Structures are given as structure tokens and as C-alpha cells.
């Protein structure tokens, strides 16, 4: 149910492909952001992707490594139908070598990734704090979004998620679903 809510909330938005890869391929954040189209095989009999690169940043600049976290991190991952369709659509409009890229087609910087993830965070009902200066003093304000309401600052944002999501939770959900389907996650 939470997966459906999350996907409905971000459908058509920049983090959609990232979230689909986390939920349905179980990739780590670093693997998703380092994934290039030359590692995604959409047109073969059994579509799959190969994990062979990882992203990290140095001084907010993206660095793509071929050395992964563990030996087992080098792997082939089959693509379920919903992820296959998502990736086919994304590839049609992509002008980048990277599956998830910035406007210039380059891998995301850390700041750009945080901005990408904000599309999700802003749709949660998580309490937020901000500061304003009133009569020369810094005053803290707290906002508690209400599920189903539109954001006051942006009518396109509806608070539709009553739970928090992290990139690692996407991978955890994938592994949990494999276990429920009696598939060995290794």
C-alpha cells in the first residue's frame, strides 16, 4: 500500500525512475546513480541490468567508480515488467549515458541528489521547521502538514505520504518482497 502511495505521489516527477530502480531492482543509491544505459538490456528475451558502477561524490562532484562495495555487488538483476516499461519510457526521452542524470546528462552531484529526493520529502506529512525574522529577531515556526492538503507555497504539491522514505528503504522493500516470494535475495 505504501509503495502504491509513493509511486502515485511521484509519477512523472524526476525521482520516479530512481524509486522504481530501488523498489524493483533493489539497487543501492550509489548503484542507481552510477547506472548507465550500456548496462541496461531492455530488448533481450529476459530483460536485465548489470550492476558494474557506483556513484559517490568528492567535494560535491560526482565520481563514478567501477569498484563496488562488495564482490557480490557485481551482479545481473532481472527486470520485472513494471520496471521494464518504466525504463523503456525513460530511455525514449533520455539524452544521457546515465539512467538518472542532471539536465546536462551528467551524473548527479550530491546537492542535485538531495534536491531530487526533496520531491518525495515535500510530499510527506513530516513536521517541518523554518525560521523568519520578525522585528529583527529570528523566530522558529513549525508546520505540520495535513494528509491530503495542498502545500501553501505550491499548489502542485499535495501532502500524500503519511510515512517517511529513505533511499535505503527502497532496497529493503525489494529484499523483503523477494523473501515473501520465497526467492533467495543472494
Segments and roles (model prediction):
Residues 1-35, 45, 72-73:
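Basic, Lys/Arg- and aromatic-enriched nucleic-acid-binding interface segment
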Residues 3, 20-24, 33, 40, ...:
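Generic alpha-helical hydrophobic packing signal
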Residues 4-15, 25, 77, 92-99, ...:
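Short, basic (Lys/Arg/His-rich) helix/loop patches that form interaction surfaces
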Residues 9-11, 30, 43-82, 90-93, ...:
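Basic, Lys/Arg-rich DNA-contacting stretches centered on the C-terminal catalytic core
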Residues 16-19, 33, 43-44, 51, ...:
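Extended hydrophobic-aromatic, low-complexity segments
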Residues 26, 37, 54, 170:
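An acidic- and aromatic-residue-enriched active-site/binding cleft used to recognize and process polar
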Residues 39-48, 164, 183-186:
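Short, polar N-cap/turn motifs at the start of nucleic acid-interacting alpha helices
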Amino acid at each position: 500500500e505504501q509503495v502504491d502511495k509513493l509511486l502515485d505521489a511521484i509519477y512523472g516527477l524526476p525521482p520516479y525512475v530512481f524509486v522504481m530502480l530501488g523498489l524493483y531492482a533493489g539497487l543501492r543509491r550509489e548503484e542507481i546513480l552510477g547506472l548507465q544505459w550500456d548496462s541496461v538490456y531492455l530488448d533481450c528475451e529476459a530483460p536485465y541490468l548489470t550492476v558494474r558502477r557506483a556513484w559517490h561524490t568528492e567535494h560535491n562532484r560526482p565520481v563514478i567508480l567501477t569498484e563496488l562495495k562488495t564482490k557480490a555487488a557485481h551482479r545481473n538483476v532481472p527486470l520485472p515488467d513494471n520496471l521494464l516499461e518504466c525504463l523503456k519510457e525513460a530511455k525514449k526521452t533520455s539524452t544521457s549515458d546515465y539512467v538518472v542524470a542532471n539536465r546536462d546528462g551528467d551524473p548527479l552531484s550530491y546537492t542535485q541528489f538531495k534536491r531530487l529526493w526533496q520531491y518525495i520529502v515535500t510530499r510527506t506529512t513530516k513536521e517541518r521547521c523554518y525560521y523568519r525574522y520578525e522585528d529583527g529577531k529570528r523566530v522558529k515556526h513549525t508546520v505540520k502538514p495535513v494528509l491530503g492538503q495542498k502545500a501553501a507555497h505550491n499548489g502542485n504539491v499535495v501532502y500524500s505520504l503519511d510515512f517517511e522514505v529513505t533511499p535505503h528503504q527502497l532496497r529493503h522493500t525489494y529484499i523483503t518482497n523477494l523473501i515473501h516470494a520465497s526467492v533467495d535475495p543472494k
